[in-house]
Amino acid sequence: MNQQKLTHYDILIKPITTEKTMLDREKRKYVFEVNVLSNKALVKNAVESLFNVKVEKVNISLVKPKPKRRGRFEGKTRRWKKAVVTLKEGYTIKELEGQQ
């Protein structure tokens, strides 16, 4: 996929809900798995348009594949990209607040 053809729904794959990310939501930080081809500007536009919020900043990191083994079969997990989105003061994503 080319970057120009990515829609907002293609950029944000799913929210990451762990104990750590749930605690970060109190600090207005939301964590998403995003498309590997996306960048900070695309993630910011996608979050702002899909959830009707204002984004203060976006931090992105590539998560490296981990070696896994099941019996005699060896492999690796897939590589993926994680985005930590910090919202401006007074904004929350209500759709994600109920998840636990």
Swiss-Prot record:
Gene Ontology terms: biological process: translation
Gene: rplW
UniProt xrefs under Pfam families: Ribosomal_L23
Keyword check for NADP: no
NCBIfam families, per the entry: PRK05738.2-4
Keywords recorded for this protein, A-Z: Ribonucleoprotein, Ribosomal protein, RNA-binding, rRNA-binding
Record protein name field: Large ribosomal subunit protein uL23
Function text: One of the early assembly proteins it binds 23S rRNA. One of the proteins that surrounds the polypeptide exit tunnel on the outside of the ribosome. Forms the main docking site for trigger factor binding to the ribosome.
Coiled-coil stretches: none
InterPro entries: Nucleotide-bd_a/b_plait_sf (IPR012677), Ribosomal_uL23-like (IPR013025), Ribosomal_uL23/eL15/eS24_sf (IPR012678), Ribosomal_uL23_CS (IPR001014)
GO cellular component entries: ribonucleoprotein complex; ribosome
Species assigned in the record: Pseudothermotoga lettingae (strain ATCC BAA-301 / DSM 14385 / NBRC 107922 / TMO)
A GO MF label: structural constituent of ribosome
Family under the similarity heading: Belongs to the universal ribosomal protein uL23 family.
Domain of life: Bacteria
Subunit structure: Part of the 50S ribosomal subunit. Contacts protein L29, and trigger factor when it is bound to the ribosome.
